[in-house]
Amino acid sequence: MEQIFKNIYTDLVNSKNKSDNPLKNFLFSSMTNTILTFYLASKKKATLEEICYNIPPKIISRSTIQNILKEGTKILFFEKELNPNDKRAKYYKLSNQGNKILEDWALSQKNNFSELKNSSKAA
C-alpha cells in the first residue's frame, strides 16, 4: 500500500515540474488550478457565478478563480462562450486540448489505482 501511495505522490510531484507542455504546466502549477480544472471537468460548462458558488471561498477566492479562468482561456486550456440568452453571462469549459491533458493524466494513474484496489482485496 505504501508503494502505491509513493507512486501517486511521485507522479504528482513530477507533474508539477516544468514540462515542455504549457497546458500540463498550467494544470499542475498550483492546487487551485487543479481544483478548478477538476471542477470544470465534472461539468459540461459553468458560469463564473456557478463556479464561485460551488467552490468555497476558503478554498479558492473569487478573484483567484477569475485569474485562473483568464489565464487558462488565454493558453487555450479552457474555452469561454457567451450565453445566447444573456450576453453578460459567460460559460467556461475545458477545451479539447485541456480535456486531453486531464484524460492522459487520469489514464496514467489507472495502474496506481488498480493496484490500490487489488491490494485492498488481498488484505
Q: What is each PLM-predicted segment?
A:
Residues 83-106:
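Short, cationic-aromatic polyanion-contact patches
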Residues 45-55:
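Short acidic, hydrophobic short linear motifs in intrinsically disordered regions
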Residues 19, 103-123:
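Amphipathic alpha-helical dimerization/coiled-coil segments
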Residues 1-6, 122-123:
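C-terminal regulatory/oligomerization modules of transcriptional regulators
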Residues 8-37:
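Short alpha-helical segments that sit at the start of domains
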Residues 40-44:
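Short helix-capping/hinge SLiMs at alpha-helix to coil transitions
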Residues 59-74:
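Short amphipathic alpha-helical interaction segments
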Residues 73-83:
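A short, conserved structural fragment
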